[in-house]
Regions:
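Residues that mark the start of a beta-strand
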Residues: 1, 27-29, 163, 187
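Glycine-rich beta-strand-centered segment in the early N-terminal region that forms part
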Residues: 19-35, 48-92, 130-133
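Cytochrome P450 core scaffold surrounding the K-helix E-X-X-R motif
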Residues: 39-46
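Residue-level marker of beta-strand positions
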Residues: 62-64, 82, 118, 163, ...
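NAD(P)H dinucleotide-binding glycine-rich loop of Rossmann-like/cofactor-binding domains
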Residues: 89-167
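Hydrophobic/small residue at the entry helix of a nucleotide-binding pocket
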Residues: 147, 172, 180
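Adenosine-nucleotide cofactor-binding segment
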Residues: 166-169, 181-227
Length: 227
């Protein structure tokens, strides 16, 4: 069973009876436990990114699950392993996206798809999870966390005296705030239009919050940073 995008701007359609393709060398069959819903995927469904050249298309690029079976040459994971599913290419074999069948219709997928009960992915799209990590949280490790925290760790690389402002306290923004907290940044400023998200940002490590519906964020940031 999977959610299929047949036409941009239209709702996904949940289809049953989809045929799982046979594993090729370097591929892994995973039973999906949880999937994140990335903003970029919503944009694709709505058609905000232009026409989808891969219709009908299986979507979802961040999730968690259990390895069911591995193809030839796969050494990174084995059946029973808990894994994160991610669009980010890691270690291991890289393969083309699997093609699924629904009757006579071919359903396309990218390197990973998670809006489904089962998914066939490349070995390099699986990351083994420690047993104690909850599956529902692990799903976010496939995109939101490495995107947000990764910007802080790999691009900004702030020192402890740094002030950081994060606009938008969604999954990526909160992950960036976490990254700034790990770096022990002096000021971590969260900006959003929803008080509920700003409250969560404080739980994640924001030292200051700004609701830009009621305050001028640029002026307020200057006041907070005193420059």
């Amino acid at each position: 069973k999977a959610a299929v995008l047949y036409e941009t701007g239209k709702p996904l359609i949940v289809e049953d009876g989809i045929e799982i393709p046979s594993l090729q060398s370097g591929q892994v069959l995973v039973k999906v436990a949880y999937s994140g819903v990335c903003r970029s995927q919503l944009m694709e469904v709505r058609g905000n990114r232009g026409e989808d050249a891969y219709l009908p298309h299986l979507l979802g690029h961040e999730g968690s699950g259990w390895v069911v079976e591995t193809g030839m040459e796969v050494t990174k994971v084995k059946p029973g392993d808990k894994v994160v599913l991610t669009w980010i290419k890691g270690e291991g074999i890289d393969c083309k996206g699997a093609k699924y069948k629904l009757g006579n219709t071919t359903l396309n997928s990218g390197g990973v798809t998670t809006f489904s009960n089962y998914t066939v992915v490349s070995e390099n799209r699986c990351v083994i999870l420690e047993e104690e990590v909850p599956m529902e949280l692990a799903a976010l490790l496939g995109c939101a966390v490495p995107t947000g925290a990764g910007i802080v760790f790999n691009t900004l690389r702030p020192n402890k005296d740094a002030s950081i402002a994060v606009f938008g306290a969604g999954g990526i923004g909160l992950s960036a705030i976490l990254g700034a907290k790990v770096h022990e940044c002096f000021r971590i400023i969260a900006v959003d239009i929803e008080d509920e998200k700003l409250a969560m940002a404080k739980e994640f490590g924001a030292t200051h919050v700004i609701n830009c519906k009621t305050e001028n964020p640029v002026k307020k940031i200057h006041e907070i940073t005193k420059n």
